[in-house]
Structure formats: structure tokens, C-alpha cells
Amino acid sequence: ALGVMVKQDLEDLGMKVNFKPVEFNSLVNKMTNTNDWDMAIMGLTGTPLEPHDGKNVWTSNGSLHLFNQRPNGYTIDDRLDWEKELDEIFREGALKLTYEERKPLYDKYQTIIYNQKPIIYLYSPIRITAIRKKFKNIFPTSLSGLIYNLDEVYIN
């Protein structure tokens, strides 16, 4: 349904779209092995509690690094400057132990992603959340869900 809606929206803007749904494993194979695709709709998941979980998407050699892909034979030396910076941030982030050391790094990575926009997020699902009154300092968001600030939640 989402693909049909995106196709219609793009056609309304004057673009010609050949929408062809494919089985998930075939899609992943095309995107990661053959580079035989122009545009894809895919859901990426992760936890808002650990920013390093995004390493497989945001580092230039990550298994789901689906933008600025390089044909076989190209080396990592042809990375864009901001991709090199992301690689370094994730390398450094893995070596830091404290929140105070890690937060500036992952804040910077989010700023780079915001500025470069290598992926366009189309939507966030509607969620219905129920919270018992005894839990305090919980503020669900449409993007981060319920537990983005788990370290600040308490029971009264």
C-alpha cells in the first residue's frame, strides 16, 4: 500500500514511476549485491537506546549502507568527506565508555545525517501507548516511541 501511495504522489509531481514490488530477500540482494535498483522503500528498525546500533546503516562499509554504494572493486578511499566523518564517529564511539564521552559523538552523527539527508524517512507508524500512572517522566514521541529516555523514568 505504501509503495502505491508513493508512486501516485511522485506521478502527481510529474515523475514517471515503474513500481515493482519484490520479495524481501530479493530486494535485499538487489540492494546489497547487484546495485540493480534506482529507488527502494524499506523499513529500518533499531533501538533509540543505543545509537551505535545504527552502525550497519551509517558506516561506509555497513551491511545496510544503501546510499553512495560503490561497485565491486572500488575501495573505501572514495568515501565522501561526511561518510569518512561518520566512520570515525562510530569508531570512536565504540571506544568510549561513559555517556558524557559518547553523547557529543552521536549528537554530531545525527547532525551530519540531518544535513546530508542520504535517506528520506517517509513516515512513522501510528502508535497507541498506555502508561500506568505510577510511571513518571515518560513522554512518548512519534519517532522515538516510549523508551528513548529510559534512564530518566521512575516509579512513584
Regions found by a protein language model. Name each.
Residues 8-22, 85, 92:
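A local structural motif
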Residues 3, 21-24, 75-87, 95, ...:
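Solvent-exposed, acidic/flexible segments
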Residues 13-68:
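Periplasmic binding protein-like
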Residues 11, 15, 32, 45, ...:
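Hydrophobic alpha-helix feature that most strongly marks membrane-spanning transmembrane helices
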Residues 1-8:
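Bilobed "Venus flytrap"/periplasmic-binding protein-like clamshell domains
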Residues 39-43, 94-133:
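Bilobed periplasmic-binding protein-like "clamshell/Venus-flytrap" ligand-binding domains
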Residues 30-35, 56-91, 124-156:
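Short, solvent-exposed loop/beta-turn-alpha elements that line the ligand-binding surface or hinge
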